[in-house]
């Protein structure tokens, strides 16, 4: 097992439902440590830049509109196999297909408003973390 960092977004729908603490608690109970966290209101430019890989997809405009519809929580999580662990906790992208007890099964209502985002690889995590956090904003958790 390897100590990794991954990136997480608690999306506008989950922030509006006031379940930020419940979601973060799930990360922590699974052995992931929050090493950076902040609430941000994404601009269209920021959201479009973050999701640029989807810019040619039919859902892109709706995705950008959703991600700018309210504040989000961006976080860096650290732990053993953090990328895979976070993806397991989130559940399937479509909450109707997500296993019971996963974040999306419990808090999401649709594939479009699915509560959370998580990096899909270590390379994506590094890129996504750098998009939102300066190196000085990510804190070592040695205690």
UniProtKB/Swiss-Prot annotation:
It comes from the Bacteria. The keyword ATP-binding applies. Its EC number is 2.7.4.6. ATP binds at residues 11, 59, 87, 93, 104, 114. It catalyses: a 2'-deoxyribonucleoside 5'-diphosphate + ATP = a 2'-deoxyribonucleoside 5'-triphosphate + ADP; a ribonucleoside 5'-diphosphate + ATP = a ribonucleoside 5'-triphosphate + ADP. It is found in: Cytoplasm. Keywords: ATP-binding, Cytoplasm, Kinase, Magnesium, Metal-binding, Nucleotide metabolism, Nucleotide-binding, Phosphoprotein, Transferase. Its cofactor is Mg(2+). InterPro entries: NDK-like_dom, NDK-like_dom_sf, Nucleoside_diP_kinase, Nucleoside_diP_kinase_AS. GO terms for molecular function: ATP binding; metal ion binding; nucleoside diphosphate kinase activity. One of its GO terms (biological process) is GTP biosynthetic process. The active site is at residue 117. Disulfide bonds: none annotated. Major role in the synthesis of nucleoside triphosphates other than ATP. The ATP gamma phosphate is transferred to the NDP beta phosphate via a ping-pong mechanism, using a phosphorylated active-site intermediate. HAMAP family: NDP_kinase. This is Nucleoside diphosphate kinase. The gene is ndk.
């Amino acid at each position: 097992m390897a100590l990794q960092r991954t990136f997480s977004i608690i999306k506008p729908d989950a922030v509006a439902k006031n379940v930020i603490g419940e979601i973060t608690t799930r990360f922590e109970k699974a052995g992931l440590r929050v090493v950076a966290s902040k609430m941000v209101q994404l601009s269209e430019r920021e959201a479009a830049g973050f999701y640029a890989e989807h810019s040619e997809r039919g859902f892109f405009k709706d995705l950008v509109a959703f991600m700018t519809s309210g504040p989000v929580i961006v976080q860096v999580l650290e732990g053993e196999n953090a990328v895979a662990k976070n993806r397991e906790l989130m559940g399937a992208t479509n909450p109707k297909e997500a296993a019971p007890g996963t974040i999306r099964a419990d808090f999401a209502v649709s594939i479009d408003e699915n509560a959370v985002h998580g990096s899909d690889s270590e390379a994506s995590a590094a890129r996504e973390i750098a998009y939102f956090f300066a190196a000085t904003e990510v804190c070592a958790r040695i205690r």
